Structures are given as structure tokens and as C-alpha cells.
Amino acid sequence: MGETEGKKDEADYKRLQTFPLVRHSDMPEEMRVETMELCVTACEKFSNNNESAAKMIKETMDKKFGSSWHVVIGEGFGFEITHEVKNLLYLYFGGTLAVCVWKCS
């Protein structure tokens, strides 16, 4: 019985780690949801290459919401940025991977 519980706990943990955890956002709801979905897609597609994932997010955001978007993806960074109001999203994905997306023109 203990083995079955361990597998269930592991499955629950993996399921929790596949959803983005938003730490801070001042984006409008619709933009935030689209950006979160884009971040999840990019991080899953380029799971071994954060630079390619960031490039995909930046290029898509530039096309969809105008230019001057910036993206940082990593496991160990801090940031202090200047950004346009209602254009910032900071989230965690996969447990330890942080994604920061902001617009600054």
C-alpha cells in the first residue's frame, strides 16, 4: 500500500509542476492568459534551451502586442527593471524555472 501512495504523491507533484505559478503580474487578464500559455508552450518545446524559448516568447509578443518586449528565463537570477504599466509577467514553471516577460520602450 505504501508503494501505491508514493506513486500517487509523485504523480500529484508532477501535475502541480506543469502549471505556471504567477508570482507577479500587472497585465490585463486576457493578455496575461495568452502570455502564460505562450511561456508554457515555449518552455516545453525548448526544455533544454532557455535562450531559444526566450527568443520564441519575445518574437511572438513583439508580433502580437507591439515591439520592445524583453524575456529572461532561468533558475537563478534577480531583477530590477523599468517597465511599461500593465506589461509585466513574472512566473515559475516546472518548479524551478522562472520566466520574466516585460515591455520597455
UniProtKB/Swiss-Prot annotation:
Entry's Gene Ontology BP terms: microtubule-based movement
Record flagged with keyword Cytoplasm: yes
Entry's localization field: Cytoplasm, Cytoskeleton, Cilium axoneme
SUPFAM superfamilies on file: DLC
Single Gene Ontology MF annotation: identical protein binding
Organism domain of life: Eukaryota
Residues that span the membrane, as ranges: none
InterPro entries in UniProt: DLC_sf, Dynein_light_chain_typ-1/2
Pfam families the record matches: Dynein_light
Main localization category: cytoplasm
GO cellular component, one term: plasma membrane
Outcome recorded upon mutating T35I: In MRMV3; uncertain significance
Keywords carried by this UniProt record: Cell projection, Cilium, Cytoplasm, Cytoskeleton, Dynein, Microtubule, Motor protein
Database matches in Gene3D superfamilies: Protein Inhibitor Of Neuronal Nitric Oxide Synthase
Cited PANTHER family: DYNEIN AXONEMAL LIGHT CHAIN 4, DYNEIN LIGHT CHAIN
Family of this protein: Belongs to the dynein light chain family.
Complex formation: Consists of at least two heavy chains and a number of intermediate and light chains.
Disease as annotated in the protein's UniProt record: Mirror movements 3: A disorder characterized by contralateral involuntary movements that mirror voluntary ones. While mirror movements are occasionally found in young children, persistence beyond the age of 10 is abnormal. Mirror movements occur more commonly in the upper extremities.
Function in brief: Force generating protein of respiratory cilia. Produces force towards the minus ends of microtubules. Dynein has ATPase activity.
Protein name in the entry: Dynein axonemal light chain 4
Species name: Homo sapiens (Human)
